[in-house]
């Protein structure tokens, strides 16, 4: 709170604060210091005025703008006499500044200067000319100032306000702030060795040491006078005739826990002003009076001027035509508004405290994370150094092995060549000795064998025998440039794991036995995703498996089980790794199967119409067409209506694998399980094996039903609602697709999406 109690000009606690038109506060002595003359009057301002105003700012007691002795501090008594018995002294004339404003609003603008504190122009202390007295200087200043105009600039918002004929007395005194400052000073405790508060109130204008006890208190000036100073500084005539002089109040006894504060005395002596009752003591609270009608108390509040007024101001003053409200009601209303505003500020202050706690936690986390990252960096670099050391050892081992291998090869070749050379040299020397002999018969006895030996020895020195088997150069080249580049490029990657993808439920849907999922990356993410991984369970609550990996954010999965519940989830990945999973979405496939004939898998002679629900053939041979659905679990039922039946053909109905042979009747290979039927009877067929002939055939308008129960692994056929023979096939397992074979004499229409009928008839007995 102390910052709120300091003057923006002097930086000390407020002394006699006044309220400027902009609602900011400033000390009265400081206000005298920063009050400046307008350009019109400033050029005629004599230098002695500056000295007079500087002295007044340093030593003027409270509310003594009209007192002649109040302009010179402790020497006020003598100065008042020097100025004569005028209505006001030099200080009063200094405060009576004429009107000046840049606009009619009473406010002006001012650009702060680097040479002025707080953007306020402070008048320098210019010495008086030689040979002139202070009284003469003040007199000259007063006479000059009466004909000049002045203004004051707020040190906080830098708005200028012109002063009327009352000068600074025209600004209201902030007694509330003054009382808060006094209580704050008293509550700060006593400095050891401080003097105790005086037992009686003392005069605030005495230049004697010690000051005389106060005899009177002026309610309008709020100043304590002794008898002598009252006669000199506050005579009961002129402008002081209407002032009310009362007995000074007794000084309050300070509590033992919080005695008088030395700081208050220091501030008072430094500023040249003391509170009534002496240092460290505050006068009892009294109601402020109107500055224009000094005998009247405030009773109303002017809404237009936003200031309290008395009833005289309403009757004859400038507030007579203004909107006014009762002072007490307005006081309570403004208190309520202030309390409400304080609640908002309190909430913001609470948020700010929590935010500061959060910032301090962030500081601690930064310290901890910094240490962790440093340790991690050291560990990673040490691991790289260790890996490089191990690789260095491996490479050195390879070089050593290569060197030893080359040395061994060379030594082996040296030994072999040395042996051959010794043998050849010995043979050569022996042959030379034989040639030297002169015995022909002896020579011829061994010449043939010797010639063969020499030839054999010569053949041993084949081509390449005198060439080194290995080179002195090593065929090992270490390319360290990529590793050096990688080391130079080793740096921190400003990327983290991607965030959790958000599933867009409004775009997720199921259709038949396929599901479509959509997702997106959260907004304002700083870790973009390079791709996504979509996982789906098996429809029975089993483990998840990846069904899609890519950059798209929309995926459709076909070929799922009907009447099944699937759980799906997605996660993102980037170069830093794989992010967390999204929330799991539950998808329910269709209860019954909806499908048509598949034009892509059917034989080219098959003719489809009616949105691929009606099939016929252009050939007299049987051709196969499959459905678009595939079943591996559940119970499924569909019907085929015979639209045309000519010349007693044998259409076949059933199920098949996707790889079934399509240019012959259904059931002749091991990829199909079927019932073929004519107009009189039917047979079951698989792997070209005909079984269970049953009476009863089909004709135009007949309906053939197929029931595939993969829970019981059975296949059953029906004609016109009656089961045709026993259960056709058992132990069927795997993935099956609806299938049909027919020729040009038959046309059938497929009906799907049917519930399993509960009123199917009993089976017909088979003929065989």
Curated annotation (Swiss-Prot):
GO terms for molecular function: zinc ion binding. Residues 332-369 form a coiled coil. SUPFAM superfamilies: B-box zinc-binding domain, Concanavalin A-like lectins/glucanases, Fibronectin type III, RING/U-box. Residues 435-493 form the COS domain. A zinc finger (RING-type) spans 7-42. GO terms for cellular component: cytoplasm; cytoskeleton. A zinc finger (B box-type) spans 201-248, 285-327. This is Tripartite motif-containing protein 67.
């Amino acid at each position: 709170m102390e910052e709120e109690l300091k003057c923006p000009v002097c930086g000390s606690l407020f002394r006699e604060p006044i309220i400027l038109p902009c609602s900011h506060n400033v000390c009265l002595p400081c206000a005298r210091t920063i009050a400046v003359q307008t350009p019109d009057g400033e050029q005629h301002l004599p230098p002695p005025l500056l000295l007079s105003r500087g002295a007044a700012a340093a030593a003027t007691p409270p509310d003594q703008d009209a007192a002649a002795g109040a302009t010179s501090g402790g020497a006020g008594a003598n100065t008042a006499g020097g100025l004569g018995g005028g209505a006001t002294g030099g200080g009063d004339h200094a405060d009576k500044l004429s009107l000046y404003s840049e606009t009619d609003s009473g406010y002006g603008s001012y650009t702060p200067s680097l040479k002025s504190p707080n953007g306020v122009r402070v008048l320098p202390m210019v010495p008086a000319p030689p040979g002139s007295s202070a009284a003469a200087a003040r007199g000259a200043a007063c006479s000059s100032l009466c004909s000049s105009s002045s203004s004051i600039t707020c040190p906080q918002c830098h708005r200028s306000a012109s002063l009327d004929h009352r000068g600074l007395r025209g600004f209201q005194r902030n007694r509330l702030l003054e009382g808060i400052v006094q209580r704050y000073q008293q509550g700060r405790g006593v400095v050891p060795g401080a003097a105790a508060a005086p037992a009686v109130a003392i005069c605030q204008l005495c230049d004697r040491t010690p000051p005389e006890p106060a005899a009177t208190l002026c309610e309008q000036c709020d100043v304590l006078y002794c008898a002598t100073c009252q006669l000199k500084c506050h005579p009961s005539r002129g402008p002081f005739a209407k002032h009310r002089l009362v007995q000074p109040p007794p000084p309050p006894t300070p509590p033992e826990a919080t005695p008088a504060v030395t700081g208050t005395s220091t501030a008072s002596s430094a500023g040249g002003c003391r509170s009534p009752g002496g240092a460290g003591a505050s006068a009892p609270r009294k109601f402020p009076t109107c500055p224009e009608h000094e005998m009247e108390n405030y009773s109303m509040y002017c809404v237009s001027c936003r200031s309290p007024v008395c009833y005289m101001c309403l009757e004859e003053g400038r507030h007579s035509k203004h909107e006014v409200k009762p002072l007490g009601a307005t006081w309570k209303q403004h208190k309520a508004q202030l309390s409400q505003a304080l609640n908002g500020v309190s909430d913001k202050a609470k948020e700010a405290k929590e935010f500061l706690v959060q910032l301090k936690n962030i500081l601690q986390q930064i310290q901890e994370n910094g240490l962790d990252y440093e340790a991690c960096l050291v560990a990673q670099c040490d691991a790289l150094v260790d890996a490089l050391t191990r690789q260095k050892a491996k490479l050195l081992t390879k070089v050593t092995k290569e060197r030893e291998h080359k040395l061994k090869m060379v030594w082996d070749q040296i030994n072999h060549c040395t042996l051959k050379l010794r043998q050849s040299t010995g043979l050569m020397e022996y042959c030379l000795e034989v040639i030297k002999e002169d015995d022909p018969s002896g020579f011829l006895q061994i010449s043939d064998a010797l010639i063969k030996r020499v030839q054999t020895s010569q053949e041993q020195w084949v081509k390449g025998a005198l060439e080194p088997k290995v080179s002195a150069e090593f065929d090992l080249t270490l390319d360290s440039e990529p590793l050096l580049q990688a080391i130079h490029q080793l740096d921190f990657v400003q990327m983290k794991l991607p965030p959790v993808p958000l599933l867009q439920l409004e775009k997720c849907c199921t259709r038949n036995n396929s599901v479509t999922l959509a997702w997106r990356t959260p907004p304002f993410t700083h870790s973009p995703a390079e791709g996504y991984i979509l996982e789906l369970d098996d429809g029975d609550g089993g483990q998840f498996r990846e069904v899609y990996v890519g950059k798209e954010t929309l995926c459709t999965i076909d070929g799922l089980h009907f009447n099944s519940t699937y759980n799906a989830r997605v996660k993102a990945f980037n170069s830093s790794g794989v992010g967390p999973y999204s929330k799991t979405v539950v998808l329910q496939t269709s209860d019954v199967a909806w499908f048509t004939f598949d034009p892509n898998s059917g034989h080219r002679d098959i003719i489809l119409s009616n949105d691929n629900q009606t099939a016929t053939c252009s050939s007299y041979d049987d051709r196969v067409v499959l459905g678009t659905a595939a079943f591996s679990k559940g119970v499924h039922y569909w019907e085929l209506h015979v639209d045309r039946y000519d010349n007693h053909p044998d259409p076949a109905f059933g199920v098949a694998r996707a790889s079934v042979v399509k240019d012959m009747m259904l059931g002749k290979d091991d990829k199909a399980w079927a019932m073929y039927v004519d107009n009189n009877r039917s047979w079951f067929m698989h792997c070209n094996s005909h079984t269970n002939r049953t009476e009863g055939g089909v004709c135009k308008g007949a309906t053939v039903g197929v029931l595939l129960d993969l829970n019981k692994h059975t296949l059953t056929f029906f004609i016109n609602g009656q089961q045709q023979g026993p259960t056709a096939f058992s132990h069927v397992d795997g993935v099956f697709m609806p299938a049909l074979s027919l020729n040009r004499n038959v046309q059938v229409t497929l009906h799907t999406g049917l519930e399993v009928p509960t009123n199917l008839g009993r089976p017909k007995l088979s003929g065989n």
